[in-house]
Amino acid sequence: MRYDLRALRRFLIFALPLLVLTMGLFHSALEVLRLAPDPAVLSRSTVAALPGWVVLATWILEAVGLAALYLLMVGRGGSRWTAGLLAGWIAWVFRGPLLVVTVVGLAGLPPRPWWGMAFSWWILYTLCGLVLGAAASAARLQA
């Protein structure tokens, strides 16, 4: 699995900011449409909002992880778009159902709002997978 370094650099320059932008716009859209979950329903304790830099750092970490997973997937051959969707859905399994089962099971919280969040994360990670495929096409990334 070898990549042309110029194409890989172009891919990362396209993909990382686009993924962070996608995550930010998605979360903003949820808040504007009032579909974002109420933090009081998700926790038993009083919940303070995370500082903005923590949220941004989390999105950057997610973007790097998604891009790395995408590169592993597309390096095995196949379509860029399929690899993008698979990378997004694999990441969603850990961010969605496994996280919900763990948090709800260990904390004894009501599962309904958590499953709603997991579904919205599935939509987000599907979009992120398509963004990865588009970035790879724009960068002319070849495995």
Residue spans for each PLM region:
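Juxtamembrane/disordered regions of integral membrane proteins
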Residues: 1-143
